[in-house]
Amino acid sequence: MSTILESLPTGQKVGIAFSGGLDTSAALHWMKLKGAVPYAYTANLGQPDEDDYDAIPKRAIEYGAAGARLIDCRAQLVAEGIAALQSGAFHITTAGVTYFNTTPIGRAVTGTMLVAAMKEDGVNIWGDGSTYKGNDIERFYRYGLLVNPDLKIYKPWLDQTFIDELGGRAEMSEFMNQAGFAYKMSAEKAYSTDSNLLGATHEAKDLESLESGIKIVNPIMGVAFWRDDVKIAAEEVTVRFEAGQPVALNGVEFKDQVELLLEANRIGGRHGLGMSDQIENRIIEAKSRGIYEAPGLALLYIAYERLVTGIHNEDTIEQYRENGRRLGRLLYQGRWFDPQAIMLRETAQRWVARAITGEVKIELRRGNDYSILSTKSPNLTYQPERLSMEKVASTFSPRDRIGQLTMRNLDITDTRDKLRVYSQVGLLTPGETSALPQIKGDGDK
């Protein structure tokens, strides 16, 4: 039996992830008029552009919800965000600038916590505002069914009747006004924005064109660092970790991780830190483009990565990075709680993060321009005296190095033999000015 309902289940409880915006407001009232019994569930994710969460469930009741609940997801959101940071679960980068998977993390939290609340209320049908071309429809589908195996999915935006009657924002606004709610449609922006406490995503509309850049975006978590009229003074900040957990900023300890991240957002936001412009592959493998903000996570990540490189050896760091990229992709796909993801997370949190204790001082300037000023940790394996060019007690002698280099003769000989084989089969051609052969181009005869 299909878990996806293509038409409204009249007479039944239908839970809707309710943001209070035009789309979900119109959908909720429409479902009520068509005979369903809507229940509204709002996730408090600490969105920087939402200033009155308590009013949202009240509006849902006004629009016809049989019940409305506000679910505080902030602590869980930050916990999952720090777990992603500890694991390096970020696979989308451009020239070293990282997207911190803030929307996928938010969906993992929303998709599980809201469905758990619905299950408590005996609501086994769930709807949300995700469209069929995006990533969220699959993320919510997976997380919802993980929590409630009896869950059915009803999405108004997949119901042709709803689309025919309320297919656009103008129609939705008119529908709400005719119902007596005096709903004033907000002015259309040149792009859409989705946010939570970890970060913000700006995409679609004008940003679908690669000829439009970051300069059309109005940041909601920081400053437009590219504008000459925005004055940004350099600022030094210290970040301290204990056993992989961020615990202090500028010497101030935080017992509450939510408060720590809020302060990290304020510090990083003053500089526009953590903004990036990325082209990515959606779950369905179509490319999309987004401009992202994550000032707090970016600040913590700089310090965390610095300590990782100062504490762990090369092979551990390599495994951490490779696993992190794989884990980031799983997170992006809505598989954050799948066994293979848990395995990768636990490995990084146990064997990488727990050794990360120390303090890093960073100078922040404009955007992602920063300098690391100092690094302190009782666990550092960085010992400059081992490699000092001064006359100091050394862990090895010149004669030891001669022996080590002599042992390299075997693999150098092996490489030379392989190059000769490649030349014999026509893959390489002898160099004219070098003893080394040259790679043949496709046009070479």
From Swiss-Prot:
Residues that hold L-citrulline according to the record: Y99, N135, R139, S192, T201, E203, E280
Binding-site list for L-aspartate: T131, N135, D136
Disulfide-linked positions: none
Subcellular location: Cytoplasm
Catalytic activity entry: L-citrulline + L-aspartate + ATP = 2-(N(omega)-L-arginino)succinate + AMP + diphosphate + H(+)
Enzyme class: ligase
Chain sites annotated for binding ATP: A17, F18, S19, G20, G21, L22, D23, T24, S25, A43, G129, T131, D136, D194
CDD domains named among the record's database cross-references: ASS
GO biological process, one term: urea cycle
Family under the similarity heading: Belongs to the argininosuccinate synthase family. Type 2 subfamily.
Protein name: Argininosuccinate synthase
Organism expressing this protein natively: Burkholderia cenocepacia (strain HI2424)
